[in-house]
C-alpha cells in the first residue's frame, strides 16, 4: 500500500525478481513516501499496471519522471536494456527511455552491468554502489552487497572493476525452509559475536 503523497517530483523504483520497491522523491532528493509491490509480471503493460497500483497517489497532472533499476530492464521486463561491460562507472551517462501508455508517466531504465570473465551480471546493485560512491568518491576496495544473490564488487577510481555473485542468501533460505536441518536451524538464535567474526574474516581475506 502506498502512502498518499500527490505530486512527487520524480519516482525511483528498484525492481527485483520477487517484487519491487518505489520511492516518491522531491527535486532535492528527499524521500516523500515509499511503497512496495509484487513482481512476477512480464512485458511493459503488466509492469506499468503493477507500478500504477502503488504509485498512482503520487502522480500529479503532468508527466512524472520514473527511473527504474533492476529486473525491469531485463528480458521479459518493461524493456530490455543493453549491458555495460566492466570496467565502467556504476551508472551510465544516459538512462534508456521505456514505452509507457499512461500519459502521466515518463519511464526511464538504468542499464545493467556485465562481466565476461568470469561471466556475471548485475541489474540494480550498480545503483547501490553509485549511492555508496556519492558519499565516499575516493573509495578503493571491495563493496559487499548482501541479498538473495550476494555480490562482491571491486571498486577503484570511481569504477566497478570486477565483481562476483554468490547464492548465499538463496542457499540459506533453502536450508532453513526445506532441508533436513530445518528443525535445528529454526531454533537457533542470532549470534552477534559469530557475525562479527565472519565479517572480520571476509574483510581480511576478500
Please annotate each region the language model reported:
Residues 10-14, 65-67, 141-145:
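Short glycine-aspartate micro-motif
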Residues 13-19, 71, 145-149, 168:
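A short acidic Gly-Thr/Ser loop motif
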Residues 22, 77-79, 153-155:
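Short glycine-/acidic-enriched loop or helix-start segments at secondary-structure transitions
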Residues 56-122:
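Short beta-strand-loop/turn "lid" adjacent to the catalytic site in phosphate-handling enzymes
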Residues 113-142, 146-205:
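Glycine-rich phosphate-binding loop plus the immediately following alpha-helix
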